[in-house]
Amino acid sequence: MVANNIPDDRSYTDEHEWVMISPGQTSVPSTPVRVGITSVAAAALGELVFLDLPDVGSDIEAGQSCGEVESTKTVSELYPPVSGKVTSLNQAAIDDPSLVTQDPYGTGWLFEVQATQLGPLLTAEVYAEKNGA
């Protein structure tokens, strides 16, 4: 763990998303990877009330908006850290968006992707430094 509970077992984006890809990994994983938002994003958003996630089977592109998270404060777009095909959604989080803010790195994950290409990724340490975490 790095400061502000930023787990160091995954990679991050400047847009405050994480992906379960080992830091420094440059090859595309052969199995689907989980995607979620960071604790920094969750804290800034506050109480989440709605998740608009990409459909299973849809193709998404790293860095291009693929959905939204809506809180009592604002609506924020989701920018996936990888390109690929969405293989599953976290139905528990869709049914109860508070899971995303309560446990963004565990039960609050958003969706899984069979990645075809990695976007620009950061280590936990770099992400924490950039975000004062």
Predicted segments, located by residue:
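ATP/adenylate-binding site constellation spanning eukaryotic-like Ser/Thr protein kinases
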Residues: P80-S83, A115
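Short, charged/polar surface micro-motifs in flexible loops or helix N-caps
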Residues: A42-A43, K85-V86, A92-A93
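A short beta-loop-beta micro-motif enriched in histidine and acidic residues
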Residues: G46-L48, T72-V75
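Acidic, low-complexity mobile loops and tails
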Residues: M1-S65, S98, D103-A133
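Short, charged beta-turn/beta-strand-edge "cap" motif at the junction between a beta-strand
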Residues: C66-G67, T72-T74, A92-A93, Q117
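Short glycine-/small-residue motifs
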Residues: P32, E68, L89
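Residue-level recognition of beta-strand microenvironments
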Residues: V19-S22, T72, L89
